[in-house]
Structure formats: structure tokens, C-alpha cells
Amino acid sequence: MNVFDKYAEEYDKWFDENEIIYKSEIEALKRHIPKGRGLEIGVGTGRFAKPFNIKIGVDISKEMAKIAEKRGIKVIIAKGEDLPFKDEEFDFFLINTVLEFAENPKKMIEEAKRVLKRGGKIIIGIIDRDSFLGKMYEEKKQKSKFYKDANFLSAKEVIEMLKELGFKNIKATQTIFKEIDKVDKVEVKEGYGEGGFVAISAEKI
């Protein structure tokens, strides 16, 4: 049993206990989300799919999937690097705090590109490794049941991967400018380099 199966309820509860952080991430991602048919890789408990009206998700955790399905999301148990979909099926794609757990992050983005329609958008949320928050998570990850096996990426690395794979119109927004327990309001800025959480979007041409 993987850690996300074992602690699915605890993971989901974290977002209730840290509501400002959750709302901050939603707000940063929302600026990139287009209309149309969306898919989320690593849909987890559906915390991000539901507010963005994403009806279908992929995850490897069956216990997480059960919670997501209670939120009205259809979950397919599969890996993000090997999606069970035809080419050019979706208008947009969300990968939120999942790349850091991928065996091959670039392959996951490449697979997302395959199932995206032309003109479709990929939206990626990360804890920026180069940020104060990323450095803090990196230092403490051995003590974390969730992030122990994470390989954090920087916003620069993700942007570089997107460019290498031929994506265009790359944009970023950032949030969480203080330690998590000190954040008292939702604040989002364009770009990256200050915030701990970065949302990056790009277009398939």
C-alpha cells in the first residue's frame, strides 16, 4: 500500500485545516484554467478538479480515488506517464503537485501533450524548489510521510521542459509568500521567484 492510499483521509483533511493555503493555490491555478473538457493527472481526492469543473482524473491511489468519486469525479487508476486516452482528447490538462512524484516528469508532460488538442493548455502546479518554501520542504522531507520520496523541481526547470517539448505562450503565477502557518490572506502575483507555490501554463501549438 502506498502512502497516499494509507493516509488518503489525512491528506484530504489537510486542506480543511489549511484553508488559506488551499484557496491561495486555487486562485493561482484559476488564472490559467480555460473552458472546455479537462483532465487532471494525480487527481488525488478531487480537491482541485472539483472547483475547476474537471470531471475526469487519473491517479494511482485507489483510496484517494474513492474520495474523489464522492466529489463526482470519474477516476481511472493509471500512471500519468502512460495515459489510457486517444490523441487530442482534452482541451486542458492539470498536473498539480504531482510532477515531483513522477518517475519521469518530462515523459508525463509529453504524454499530456499527446492527449491535448491543438491550442489546448497544460497547467502545472509546483512547490518551487528554489523558493524559501521549496528549500524548507527539501530540508524536512525525510520527516514527511507525503514528501519523503518527492523530487522537487524549480519553476525554471519546468519551463525549460515545456519549451523543449514545443509548448508556447508560457505563463506563471505565484502565491504563498510566507511560511504556511503565517499566511493570513490570499495573495497572487504574476511570474515566479518569490512565491513558494507556482502555477505554470503553456499552450500546445
Swiss-Prot record:
Pfam families per record: Methyltransf_11
Source organism of the structure: Methanocaldococcus jannaschii (strain ATCC 43067 / DSM 2661 / JAL-1 / JCM 10045 / NBRC 100440)
Family that this chain belongs to: To M.jannaschii MJ0638 and MJ1252 and M.tuberculosis Rv2003c.
Sample GO molecular function, one term: methyltransferase activity
Top-level division of the source organism's lineage: Archaea
Protein's UniProt name: Uncharacterized protein MJ1123
